[in-house]
Every structure is written in structure tokens, then in C-alpha cells.
Amino acid sequence: MARNKDMNRNAGSREAFKRAALGAKNNAYELIAEFDPEYFSYLKGLYVDGTFGSQGALPRKTRELIMIGITCALNRPRGVRLHIQRALSLKATPREILEAVEVAAIPGGLPGLWLGAESLRDVLKAQGRKFQ
């Protein structure tokens, strides 16, 4: 009974994650929602409500560009790819994304630069686009 209540409560949280994802696929959210609905609810509060779902001084596109730089510097391929997809959906140009990747090379080193450049190429190719 309690599990059904948790699943119903998290239905709205799942939809909020999907909206915040801007079409970028990340099935890990569904797993966390299934395995630990209570934690998923807290995660939604931090990630969706507090970071990417709220309006603040920085536009969402700028936040995504920052996340690209951070995930490159930390060498997180999945995060780099997801945030590139989201930035593109928010009308970031490939040049803006590349500059976020290049800035990340200072604190993160060349492996982050290579990761970001390759990820940008791969995402653009998957979308049938070219770097311009």
C-alpha cells in the first residue's frame, strides 16, 4: 500500500524530470524512482525545482553551458552528452558549446577538452547537423 502511494506521488516528479531533461534521454531517473521513491522525491527537489526548473538570474541555456564545462572538467561522458543535447535544444550554437568545452580545459585538462569535442561531434552527427 505504501509503495503504491510512493509511486503515485512520484508520477508528478517523473514528469517534472522529463520536462527538465528537454528531450535528452536518461533512463537512470526511472530506475531511481522505482528503487527508492522517497530519495527520488528529494532529488527532484534539488535538481528540477532548485537548479534547472527554476527561473533565476542565469537563463537555462547558460546553466546548461556551465554544466557542459563542469562535466567536461570532471570527465563525465554521460553528463557531457546530456547537457550538450539540452543546450542545443535551448538554441545554444555549436560554437557556444565548444567555447564552454574549451574553458573547461583550463581546470580539467586536455582529456576534458577531447571528451567535450568528441561528444559535441557525436551529438551533432546523431541530430544530422554539422559544426558551424
Regions found by a protein language model. Name each.
Residues 1-62, 115-132:
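Acidic, glycine/proline-rich low-complexity segments that act as flexible tails and inter-domain linkers
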Residues 17, 71-72:
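A generic structural signal for short
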Residues 60-61, 95, 108:
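Aromatic- and histidine-enriched alpha-helix N-cap/loop-to-helix transition segments
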Residues 63-71, 100:
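Short, structured motif recognition centered on aromatic/hydrophobic residues
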Residues 73-98:
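Mid-chain, well-packed structural core segment of small domains
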Residues 85-92, 108, 119-128:
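Short alpha-helical linear motifs
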Residues 103, 110-111:
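Substrate/cofactor-recognition hotspot
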